[in-house]
From Swiss-Prot:
Keyword match Disulfide bond: yes
GO biological process: defense response to fungus; killing of cells of another organism
UniProt name for this protein: Defensin-like protein 54
Record keyword Metal-binding present: no
Signal peptide: 1-27
Organism taxonomic ancestry: Eukaryota, Viridiplantae, Streptophyta, Embryophyta, Tracheophyta
A Gene Ontology cellular-component term: extracellular region
Keywords: Antimicrobial, Disulfide bond, Fungicide, Plant defense, Secreted, Signal
Length: 79
């Protein structure tokens, strides 16, 4: 009986650890873009950091732009 109880406890700790690590990833994807201004579009192979920077700096109120978050979005920073 003691072996089953210990095994169940270890199993639950592993499951909780894995589930909390997913919450951290989700929180990062929400918090990180909040540091920036407008997030215009999703970044992909065609739209990378360079394209994001170019699009943001063409608007007069933004100083720069970066692909941030998960999934990555082009977010502009006011200057």
């Amino acid at each position: 009986m003691g072996i089953k109880k210990t095994s169940a406890t270890v199993f639950l700790v592993i499951i909780l650890t894995i589930s909390f690590s997913y919450y951290d990833v989700e929180a990062e994807s929400v918090i990180e873009p909040a540091k920036y201004g407008a997030c215009l579009f999703l970044c992909d192979a065609r739209r990378d950091d360079h394209a994001c920077f170019y699009d943001c700096t063409n608007v007069a109120i933004y100083r720069t732009g970066h692909c941030v978050g998960n999934p990555p979005r082009c977010c502009c920073i006011r200057g």
